[in-house]
């Protein structure tokens, strides 16, 4: 039930472990900070991270006549979250499903969740170009996917896989809103200087190659990691950080590219 959603954005990456879920959660919190009503849908069925990252583990999902009611992070219901993590009895329980069952669950998430009026629905996806991604694109044909944000790290091994994700987007007709380079440099927690411990500018070169916007470069910042398990936005806790600056830039870009 996405008829009340103005903008649907999928967050993709061809490589696992690039911080895609962290980008999804902090982007959702940044959009909320800017006065938008936001939904965050975690369709990484085998590795749902969103409930943990927002400190929502153990929360219950309820059903009403219109379908599943998402978990809200605040009383004003400005951020709604849905994840298979809420349906598992134990965080360590594996999801051992074949493709058809995964497809059915994702279709339920996209059609049977009672999203109220939302300015943005952020969909956090698993890595790669699997059944899950194809199902999402098929289900979004009616309401439309307004674009994808692709997350990468600067290493060449990640960039190779992300190039495949770009090809997937082009073949399925997904508009690429831009590329975010994550884990580029390390921010010292004491002096806040940033040191490039890996190669750098991989996201910039990839954006140039794909002819899409480069939305920003995020460093490894231990202070941001401490926020995991809370609903605190980087914009509130670390307003002067590079991460907050980049997230603010992404929000401003989305406001100009999409319907507010």
Curated annotation (Swiss-Prot):
Binding positions for ATP per the UniProt entry: 14-21
Cofactor stoichiometry and binding remark: Binds 4 [4Fe-4S] clusters per heterotetramer. Contains two stable clusters in the N-termini of Nubp1 and two labile, bridging clusters between subunits of the Nubp1-Nubp2 heterotetramer.
Annotated Pfam families:
ParA
One Gene Ontology term of the molecular function aspect: iron-sulfur cluster binding
| Listed Gene3D superfamilies | P-loop containing nucleotide triphosphate hydrolases (3.40.50.300)
A GO cellular component entry from the record: cytosol
Report the locations given in the UniProt record.
Cytoplasm
Keyword tags: 4Fe-4S, ATP-binding, Cytoplasm, Iron, Iron-sulfur, Metal-binding, Nucleotide-binding
Please list the residues that bind [4Fe-4S] cluster.
188, 191
Cofactor(s) essential for the protein: [4Fe-4S] cluster
Q: Does the keyword 4Fe-4S apply?
A: yes
Q: Which GO terms describe its biological process?
A: iron-sulfur cluster assembly
Q: What family does this chain come from, according to its entry?
A: Belongs to the Mrp/NBP35 ATP-binding proteins family. NUBP2/CFD1 subfamily.
Task: Spell out the subunit comment.
Answer: Heterotetramer of 2 Nubp1 and 2 Nubp2 chains.
**What is the role of the protein in this entry?**
Component of the cytosolic iron-sulfur (Fe/S) protein assembly (CIA) machinery. Required for maturation of extramitochondrial Fe-S proteins. The Nubp1-Nubp2 heterotetramer forms a Fe-S scaffold complex, mediating the de novo assembly of an Fe-S cluster and its transfer to target apoproteins.
- What's the protein called, per UniProt? Cytosolic Fe-S cluster assembly factor Nubp2 homolog
Organism, by scientific name, is: Drosophila melanogaster
Q: Name the lineage.
A: Eukaryota, Metazoa, Ecdysozoa, Arthropoda, Hexapoda
